[in-house]
Amino acid sequence: MQHDDVIWDLIGNKSFCSYKVKTKTQQFCRNEYNITGLCNRSSCPLANSQYATIREEKGQCFLYMKVIERAAFPSRMWEKVKLDRNYAKALEQIDENLIYWPRFIRHKCKQRLTKITQYLIRIRKLTLKRQRKLVPLSRKVERREKRREEKALIAAQLENAIEKELLDRLKQGTYGDIYNFPINAFDKAMEKQDEESESEEEEEEEDEEESGTREFIAEDEFEESDLSDFEELNNLKDSSDEEVNDEEESSEESEEESEEEEVKSKAKSKGKAPLKGPSRKKRAYVEIEYEQETEPAQKSKAT
């Protein structure tokens, strides 16, 4: 026969219990069916023939109940009842199953249910959040990966340099035809040239389209800066007109001077006309001076 007081006297006070943990302040119980986790007479699952507790298995709460009628059957000692995921309905299930049980057990079962539901909610929130996962790597693997990265970087730089040099030579026309040249690189270069030419054509078309467009602007949008810009343009036009007039006057003066010089040269070269005919003889250089005599002014008055 099971006697609760005898069992408690044996394991609680005098002899040894494998579930007992002693500390300076109090004693704890490591039994998985303990409702409070403390080692005392009311919460000991071994020294109480009528006992109930709440346990969690894979996110689901269950109510475990033990009665004296099943003490002779250890395999069927605990009755397992699945509780609803809704907290209010789970409390109602506890009240229904523990209707004639001691108030202490009912209260502790509800308290344990609240704690379990709280930490389940906390676990769900943490799983939904993004967390960093630290993956340990051995030093050998890390060194190997670093070496591979360095080699790949050097190879990529070398390939890019070779490709650039070959494209430059191809543009300069050093090679008449393509020999052992990667077709992909050539296609990329041609695509870049096509894109550049297309972009230039689009810019020219946009400039042509914008040149003939007309816009109407309100007076509010016509700011003082725009007026100042127009004044500067007018000043520039006036200055350019003055410069053009000055240039025209200077060109006219230079033309007049050149005409006068031509007239003088013609007057000097009248006596030096060459002889016509097949036979021409060289003559000595002769200077001719012309003198003009003017009558005195007195004689002209007498006549």
Swiss-Prot record:
Gene Ontology annotations of biological process type: maturation of 5.8S rRNA; maturation of LSU-rRNA
GO cellular component: nucleolus; preribosome, large subunit precursor
Acidic residues biased stretches: 193-210, 218-232, 240-262
Disruption phenotype: Embryos show various defects including CNS necrosis, a thin yolk sac extension and small head and eyes.
Domain of life from the UniProt record: Eukaryota
Subcellular location: Nucleus, Nucleolus
Keyword set includes Cytoplasm: no
InterPro entries from the UniProt entry: Mak16 (IPR006958), Ribosomal_eL28/Mak16 (IPR029004)
Function: Plays an essential role in early embryonic development.
UniProt-listed Gene3D superfamilies: 3.30.390.110
Annotated family: Belongs to the MAK16 family.
Taxonomic lineage of the native organism: Eukaryota, Metazoa, Chordata, Craniata, Vertebrata
Biased composition (Basic residues): 266-283
Gene behind the chain: mak16
Chief place of localization: nucleus
Provenance organism: Danio rerio
Name of this chain's protein: Protein MAK16 homolog
The entry's keywords: Developmental protein, Nucleus
Residue segments, region Disordered: 189-303
